[in-house]
Amino acid sequence: GDDMHGRFLKAAAERAGINTEGLVMDPAAATSLAFVALSDSGEREFSFIRDPGADTLLRPNELNQQLLRNTKVFHVGSVSLTAEPSRSSTWQALITAKSTGAAVSYDPNYRASLWADDAAACDQIRSILPIVDIIKLSQEEMPFAAGIDDVDTAIKVLRKEGVALIVITLGEGGAVVATGDQQRSVPAFPCDAVDTTGAGDAFFGGFLSEFVKSGKSVYDVSIDDMVRFARVGCATASLCIGRRGGIPSMPTMEEVTELLNG
Protein backbone atom coordinates (compact mmCIF):
# COMPACT_ATOMS: atom_id res chain seq x y z
CA GLY A 1 0.00 0.00 0.00
CA ASP A 2 1.01 3.61 -0.46
CA ASP A 3 1.08 4.09 3.31
CA MET A 4 3.79 4.49 5.95
CA HIS A 5 4.43 0.74 6.07
CA GLY A 6 4.64 0.36 2.30
CA ARG A 7 6.92 3.38 1.93
CA PHE A 8 9.14 2.07 4.73
CA LEU A 9 9.49 -1.32 3.01
CA LYS A 10 10.20 0.30 -0.38
CA ALA A 11 12.93 2.46 1.16
CA ALA A 12 14.43 -0.53 3.01
CA ALA A 13 14.57 -2.52 -0.23
CA GLU A 14 16.23 0.35 -2.07
CA ARG A 15 18.82 0.81 0.69
CA ALA A 16 19.68 -2.86 0.24
CA GLY A 17 20.26 -2.28 -3.47
CA ILE A 18 17.05 -4.00 -4.61
CA ASN A 19 15.45 -2.74 -7.82
CA THR A 20 11.89 -1.64 -7.00
CA GLU A 21 10.92 -0.81 -10.59
CA GLY A 22 8.23 -3.48 -10.59
CA LEU A 23 6.71 -2.50 -7.24
CA VAL A 24 3.10 -1.28 -7.36
CA MET A 25 1.94 1.07 -4.57
CA ASP A 26 -1.84 0.87 -4.05
CA PRO A 27 -3.23 4.26 -2.93
CA ALA A 28 -6.45 2.75 -1.57
CA ALA A 29 -5.43 -0.46 0.25
CA ALA A 30 -3.25 -0.94 3.32
CA THR A 31 0.02 -2.85 3.42
CA SER A 32 -0.41 -6.30 4.97
CA LEU A 33 1.23 -6.55 8.39
CA ALA A 34 2.91 -9.59 9.92
CA PHE A 35 3.56 -9.87 13.65
CA VAL A 36 6.12 -12.36 14.92
CA ALA A 37 6.22 -13.74 18.48
CA LEU A 38 9.49 -15.39 19.49
CA SER A 39 10.00 -18.27 21.92
CA ASP A 40 13.10 -18.53 24.11
CA SER A 41 14.68 -20.79 21.48
CA GLY A 42 14.14 -18.25 18.71
CA GLU A 43 11.24 -20.12 17.07
CA ARG A 44 8.37 -18.02 15.71
CA GLU A 45 4.61 -17.73 15.75
CA PHE A 46 2.96 -15.52 13.10
CA SER A 47 -0.18 -13.43 13.05
CA PHE A 48 -1.33 -11.15 10.22
CA ILE A 49 -3.45 -8.07 9.56
CA ARG A 50 -4.67 -8.42 5.98
CA ASP A 51 -8.34 -7.69 5.23
CA PRO A 52 -7.63 -7.32 2.40
CA GLY A 53 -3.98 -6.37 2.08
CA ALA A 54 -2.71 -4.42 -0.90
CA ASP A 55 -0.66 -7.46 -1.94
CA THR A 56 -3.83 -9.51 -2.58
CA LEU A 57 -5.23 -6.79 -4.85
CA LEU A 58 -2.48 -6.85 -7.48
CA ARG A 59 -4.22 -7.00 -10.87
CA PRO A 60 -2.83 -8.61 -14.05
CA ASN A 61 -2.82 -5.27 -15.89
CA GLU A 62 -0.47 -3.85 -13.23
CA LEU A 63 2.31 -6.35 -14.00
CA ASN A 64 5.52 -4.96 -15.50
CA GLN A 65 5.71 -7.06 -18.65
CA GLN A 66 9.16 -5.81 -19.65
CA LEU A 67 10.65 -6.91 -16.34
CA LEU A 68 8.98 -10.30 -16.56
CA ARG A 69 10.29 -10.90 -20.08
CA ASN A 70 13.85 -10.00 -19.11
CA THR A 71 14.31 -11.88 -15.85
CA LYS A 72 16.68 -14.82 -15.40
CA VAL A 73 14.91 -16.21 -12.33
CA PHE A 74 11.27 -15.59 -11.42
CA HIS A 75 10.76 -16.31 -7.74
CA VAL A 76 7.31 -16.94 -6.28
CA GLY A 77 5.72 -18.00 -3.00
CA SER A 78 2.23 -19.25 -2.23
CA VAL A 79 1.05 -16.18 -0.29
CA SER A 80 -0.05 -14.46 -3.51
CA LEU A 81 -2.14 -17.54 -4.34
CA THR A 82 -4.38 -17.16 -1.28
CA ALA A 83 -6.86 -14.73 -2.89
CA GLU A 84 -7.96 -13.02 -6.08
CA PRO A 85 -6.95 -10.99 -8.02
CA SER A 86 -3.36 -11.66 -6.91
CA ARG A 87 -3.77 -15.37 -7.73
CA SER A 88 -4.55 -14.65 -11.38
CA SER A 89 -1.77 -12.06 -11.50
CA THR A 90 0.69 -14.61 -10.14
CA TRP A 91 -0.28 -17.11 -12.81
CA GLN A 92 0.04 -14.55 -15.59
CA ALA A 93 3.45 -13.46 -14.31
CA LEU A 94 4.61 -17.08 -14.07
CA ILE A 95 3.51 -17.92 -17.60
CA THR A 96 5.06 -14.77 -19.07
CA ALA A 97 8.41 -15.26 -17.33
CA LYS A 98 8.54 -18.99 -18.07
CA SER A 99 7.65 -18.53 -21.74
CA THR A 100 10.54 -16.11 -22.22
CA GLY A 101 13.16 -18.41 -20.69
CA ALA A 102 13.19 -17.61 -16.98
CA ALA A 103 13.84 -20.31 -14.42
CA VAL A 104 10.86 -20.48 -12.03
CA SER A 105 11.90 -20.62 -8.39
CA TYR A 106 9.35 -21.56 -5.71
CA ASP A 107 9.30 -21.30 -1.93
CA PRO A 108 5.75 -22.09 -0.75
CA ASN A 109 6.36 -20.21 2.52
CA TYR A 110 3.20 -21.73 4.02
CA ARG A 111 1.41 -19.60 6.61
CA ALA A 112 -1.64 -21.42 8.00
CA SER A 113 -3.61 -18.35 9.08
CA LEU A 114 -3.64 -16.93 5.54
CA TRP A 115 -5.56 -19.90 4.13
CA ALA A 116 -9.23 -20.85 4.53
CA ASP A 117 -8.20 -24.43 5.35
CA ASP A 118 -5.46 -26.99 4.71
CA ALA A 119 -7.23 -28.44 1.67
CA ALA A 120 -7.28 -25.06 -0.07
CA ALA A 121 -3.61 -24.57 0.79
CA CYS A 122 -2.65 -27.96 -0.63
CA ASP A 123 -4.58 -27.39 -3.86
CA GLN A 124 -3.05 -24.00 -4.55
CA ILE A 125 0.48 -24.82 -3.37
CA ARG A 126 0.58 -27.88 -5.66
CA SER A 127 -1.11 -26.16 -8.59
CA ILE A 128 2.03 -24.50 -9.92
CA LEU A 129 4.44 -27.42 -9.46
CA PRO A 130 4.29 -28.44 -13.15
CA ILE A 131 5.97 -25.17 -14.21
CA VAL A 132 8.45 -24.93 -11.32
CA ASP A 133 12.17 -25.46 -12.01
CA ILE A 134 13.63 -24.89 -8.53
CA ILE A 135 11.89 -25.54 -5.22
CA LYS A 136 12.80 -25.08 -1.56
CA LEU A 137 10.66 -26.72 1.08
CA SER A 138 10.91 -26.92 4.83
CA GLN A 139 10.02 -30.20 6.53
CA GLU A 140 6.72 -28.65 7.66
CA GLU A 141 5.80 -27.74 4.09
CA MET A 142 6.42 -31.18 2.54
CA PRO A 143 2.88 -32.49 3.22
CA PHE A 144 1.37 -29.43 1.50
CA ALA A 145 3.60 -29.52 -1.58
CA ALA A 146 4.30 -33.24 -1.91
CA GLY A 147 1.57 -34.91 0.15
CA ILE A 148 4.09 -36.72 2.35
CA ASP A 149 6.38 -35.89 5.29
CA ASP A 150 9.20 -38.27 4.31
CA VAL A 151 12.14 -36.51 2.62
CA ASP A 152 13.07 -39.26 0.15
CA THR A 153 9.48 -39.84 -0.93
CA ALA A 154 8.81 -36.10 -1.24
CA ILE A 155 11.80 -35.78 -3.56
CA LYS A 156 10.45 -38.58 -5.75
CA VAL A 157 7.04 -36.88 -5.93
CA LEU A 158 8.60 -33.55 -6.91
CA ARG A 159 10.78 -35.22 -9.54
CA LYS A 160 7.67 -36.73 -11.12
CA GLU A 161 6.17 -33.24 -11.27
CA GLY A 162 9.19 -32.20 -13.35
CA VAL A 163 10.98 -30.02 -10.78
CA ALA A 164 14.65 -29.97 -11.81
CA LEU A 165 16.36 -28.68 -8.64
CA ILE A 166 14.96 -29.69 -5.24
CA VAL A 167 16.00 -28.44 -1.81
CA ILE A 168 14.51 -29.51 1.51
CA THR A 169 15.71 -27.59 4.55
CA LEU A 170 15.98 -29.39 7.87
CA GLY A 171 16.79 -26.62 10.36
CA GLU A 172 19.73 -27.68 12.49
CA GLY A 173 20.04 -30.72 10.22
CA GLY A 174 21.07 -28.58 7.26
CA ALA A 175 19.50 -29.44 3.92
CA VAL A 176 18.98 -32.20 1.38
CA VAL A 177 19.52 -31.31 -2.28
CA ALA A 178 18.52 -33.32 -5.32
CA THR A 179 18.83 -33.12 -9.09
CA GLY A 180 18.32 -35.84 -11.66
CA ASP A 181 18.56 -39.16 -9.84
CA GLN A 182 21.10 -37.92 -7.28
CA GLN A 183 20.69 -36.39 -3.84
CA ARG A 184 23.04 -35.26 -1.07
CA SER A 185 22.90 -33.95 2.48
CA VAL A 186 24.49 -30.59 3.29
CA PRO A 187 25.25 -29.86 6.97
CA ALA A 188 24.25 -26.65 8.69
CA PHE A 189 26.81 -24.26 10.14
CA PRO A 190 26.73 -24.37 13.97
CA CYS A 191 25.35 -21.23 15.59
CA ASP A 192 23.37 -19.96 18.57
CA ALA A 193 19.86 -19.21 17.33
CA VAL A 194 18.50 -15.84 18.43
CA ASP A 195 15.66 -15.38 15.93
CA THR A 196 14.78 -17.79 13.11
CA THR A 197 12.73 -15.16 11.25
CA GLY A 198 13.99 -14.98 7.67
CA ALA A 199 16.13 -18.12 7.89
CA GLY A 200 14.45 -19.78 4.92
CA ASP A 201 14.63 -16.59 2.86
CA ALA A 202 18.29 -16.17 3.76
CA PHE A 203 19.04 -19.75 2.76
CA PHE A 204 17.26 -19.52 -0.57
CA GLY A 205 18.68 -16.08 -1.31
CA GLY A 206 22.20 -17.46 -0.87
CA PHE A 207 21.34 -20.55 -2.92
CA LEU A 208 19.78 -18.62 -5.80
CA SER A 209 22.60 -16.07 -5.82
CA GLU A 210 25.10 -18.85 -6.46
CA PHE A 211 22.83 -20.42 -9.07
CA VAL A 212 22.63 -17.14 -11.01
CA LYS A 213 26.39 -16.60 -10.72
CA SER A 214 27.00 -20.07 -12.16
CA GLY A 215 25.41 -19.02 -15.45
CA LYS A 216 24.00 -22.53 -15.85
CA SER A 217 20.51 -23.56 -16.85
CA VAL A 218 18.61 -25.71 -14.37
CA TYR A 219 19.25 -28.72 -16.60
CA ASP A 220 23.03 -28.25 -16.52
CA VAL A 221 23.36 -28.01 -12.73
CA SER A 222 25.17 -31.02 -11.24
CA ILE A 223 24.75 -32.47 -7.77
CA ASP A 224 28.13 -30.96 -6.85
CA ASP A 225 26.81 -27.57 -7.94
CA MET A 226 23.73 -28.11 -5.78
CA VAL A 227 25.91 -28.85 -2.76
CA ARG A 228 27.94 -25.70 -3.40
CA PHE A 229 24.82 -23.56 -3.76
CA ALA A 230 23.36 -25.05 -0.57
CA ARG A 231 26.56 -24.47 1.44
CA VAL A 232 26.23 -20.78 0.65
CA GLY A 233 22.57 -20.98 1.64
CA CYS A 234 23.39 -22.69 4.94
CA ALA A 235 26.07 -20.10 5.73
CA THR A 236 23.68 -17.24 4.95
CA ALA A 237 20.93 -18.74 7.11
CA SER A 238 23.35 -19.38 9.98
CA LEU A 239 24.37 -15.72 10.09
CA CYS A 240 20.73 -14.61 9.79
CA ILE A 241 19.43 -16.57 12.79
CA GLY A 242 22.20 -15.26 15.02
CA ARG A 243 20.56 -11.81 14.87
CA ARG A 244 17.12 -10.35 15.50
CA GLY A 245 14.68 -9.23 12.84
CA GLY A 246 13.68 -10.25 9.35
CA ILE A 247 15.51 -7.53 7.40
CA PRO A 248 18.34 -6.30 9.70
CA SER A 249 19.47 -9.91 10.22
CA MET A 250 20.37 -10.48 6.58
CA PRO A 251 24.16 -10.78 6.21
CA THR A 252 26.38 -9.27 3.53
CA MET A 253 28.10 -11.42 0.92
CA GLU A 254 31.40 -10.55 2.59
CA GLU A 255 30.18 -12.03 5.89
CA VAL A 256 28.99 -15.16 4.13
CA THR A 257 32.31 -15.59 2.33
CA GLU A 258 34.21 -15.14 5.59
CA LEU A 259 32.15 -17.88 7.27
CA LEU A 260 32.59 -20.22 4.30
CA ASN A 261 36.35 -19.70 4.33
CA GLY A 262 36.74 -19.76 8.11
Show which residues each predicted segment covers.
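Short gly/ser/thr-rich secondary-structure transition/capping motifs
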Residues: 52-61, 114-120, 148, 218
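Conserved beta-alpha-beta core of the PfkB/ribokinase-like small-molecule kinase fold
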Residues: 73, 79-157, 163, 173-174
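Conserved N-terminal subdomain of the carbohydrate kinase-like
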Residues: 1-78, 257-262
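Short glycine/serine/threonine/alanine-rich loop segments
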Residues: 18, 102, 246
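Conserved phosphate-binding/catalytic region of the ribokinase-like
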Residues: 95-96, 147-262
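Short, hinge-like loop/turn segments at secondary-structure boundaries
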Residues: 12-15, 39-42, 121-125, 153-155, ...
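Glycine-rich phosphate/pyrophosphate-binding beta-alpha loops
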Residues: 32, 78-82, 237, 243-246
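Conserved residues at the C-terminal ends of beta-strands
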Residues: 26, 77, 138, 169, ...
